[in-house]
C-alpha cells in the first residue's frame, strides 16, 4: 500500500534573476563560498525530518544545472522537477499540480539561503491548526505611499510586517485558493497568502528571523556572504 506524504515542499527556483546584475546565470546558481545559493536552501529541507518530499520549480533553460546540484549534494528528497510559469502565481500552481494530495504544502523561495528550521517547523504546525501560515518579520523602516512623485500617506508600522518564507498551507486550502483565483481571473499575486485571504481563508503570522532574507540584488548577495561568515564564527544563532 502506498504511503501518503504528510508534508511536501514546493521550492521556487525558476526565476531569471533580472534584478541581479553582473552574472551570466540566474542568481539561484550564483555561489556563496563555492556553493550555489539554491543549495543552501535545499540543504535545510533535505535535513528536516518533517519534510517528506521536495518539488523543485525550475527555469527550464538551465535544467541540467538543477540536476547537477541535486546530484552533487545528494538531495534525495527532490523527486520532481517542474518548469516554472511566467509569474510566481503560475509557478506555484504548476508545482501544486505536480504533487499528490498531502496534509501540508510548504512554499519556499529558493533564493532564501538561511531560512531557519525553527520558523519552518512552527509554520507547518500553524498551518495544521489554522489552515495557512506565513513567516513574517517586523517592518523596521518607515513605509510611505507615493503617487505621481509625491508621498500621500505614511502608514502606522505598528502592525506592518514583511512577508518572508516559507508560507505553509493545508493542501486543500492552497488548492481552493488557486482554484478561486483561476475562476476569478486573478493573476499576478505576489504570494499565496494573498490568494488564501482573497478566497475567504485566514493566515496565521509566524515570527521569523531577519536571516531569512531573499537574495534579489547584488547587495543581498554580498550581505549573505557576511551572514555566512558570522554564522561560522558563532556570532549568529
PLM features: what roles do these ranges have?
Residues 114-206, 237:
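Conserved core of the sugar-phosphate nucleotidyltransferase
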Residues 102-111:
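Short beta-strand-to-loop acidic/aromatic patch adjacent to the donor-nucleotide binding site
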Residues 42-46, 70, 99:
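Hydrophobic C-terminal alpha-helix "anchor/cap" residues
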Residues 1-10, 191-193, 197, 210-211, ...:
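SAM-dependent methyltransferases
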Residues 11, 38, 95, 108-109, ...:
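Residue-level signal for inorganic ion chemistry
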Amino acid at each position: 500500500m502506498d504511503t501518503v506524504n504528510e508534508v511536501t515542499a514546493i521550492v521556487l527556483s525558476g526565476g531569471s534573476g533580472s534584478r541581479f546584475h553582473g552574472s551570466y546565470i540566474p542568481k539561484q546558481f550564483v555561489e556563496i563560498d563555492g556553493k550555489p545559493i539554491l543549495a543552501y536552501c535545499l540543504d535545510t529541507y533535505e535535513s528536516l525530518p518533517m519534510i517528506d518530499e521536495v518539488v523543485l520549480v525550475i527555469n527550464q533553460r538551465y535544467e541540467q544545472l538543477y540536476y547537477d546540484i541535486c546530484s552533487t549534494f545528494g538531495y534525495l528528497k527532490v523527486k520532481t522537477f517542474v518548469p516554472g510559469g511566467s509569474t510566481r502565481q503560475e509557478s506555484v500552481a504548476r508545482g501544486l499540480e505536480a504533487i499528490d494530495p498531502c496534509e501540508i504544502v510548504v512554499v519556499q523561495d529558493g533564493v532564501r539561503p538561511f531560512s531557519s528550521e525553527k520558523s519552518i517547523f512552527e509554520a507547518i504546525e500553524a498551518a495544521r491548526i489554522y489552515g495557512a501560515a506565513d513567516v513574517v518579520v517586523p517592518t523596521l523602516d518607515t513605509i510611505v505611499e507615493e503617487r505621481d512623485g509625491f508621498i500621500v500617506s505614511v502608514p502606522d508600522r505598528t502592525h506592518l510586517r514583511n512577508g518572508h518564507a516559507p508560507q505553509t498551507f493545508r493542501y486543500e486550502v492552497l488548492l481552493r485558493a488557486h482554484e478561486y483565483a483561476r475562476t476569478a481571473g486573478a493573476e499576478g499575486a505576489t504570494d499565496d497568502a494573498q490568494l488564501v485571504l482573497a478566497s475567504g481563508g485566514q493566515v496565521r503570522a509566524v515570527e521569523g528571523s531577519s536571516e531569512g532574507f531573499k537574495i534579489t540584488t547584488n547587495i543581498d548577495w554580498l550581505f549573505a556572504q557576511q551572514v555566512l561568515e558570522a554564522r561560522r564564527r558563532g556570532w549568529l544563532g
